[in-house]
Amino acid sequence: MCASVTVPVLHMIKLTAEELMRHEITRAGLLATDGTVQSGIYETCFAGSGIELITPSPEAQAAVMDLTYNGVKAGKLDFDTSGFEKAVNELFDKGAQTLILGCTELPPAFDMYGLDYEHIDPTLVLARAAVLAAGGKLREA
């Protein structure tokens, strides 16, 4: 509950931190747009969670942006993902146990390009929480 409203508020990033904590993740690589990374919102919301966020190097971040804008948003099904995959591998090399897909273009990218890395989709975490908050039930996967 937020102080300024009288209804429950589902906070996507905090819910993501809680989900990672349930899975005993202590180090996660953050894949997101430049603006999201630079804003520090994930770091702020993850404070006190015990989860260390690992962000891409500037070169790797450029590859994330390239995939997002020149691949997914441009609708290029034959986009070369090697730069992005190098960025992802860099995060795992730095100790990430999973990836946070902190941009709504990234889950479709994983599907479009057959990317197979351990990850969490904050939008899906939020959707599940919304269903449960509304009294619904989730299907077993």
Predicted segments, located by residue:
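Non-catalytic structural scaffold of enzyme domains
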Residues: 1-141
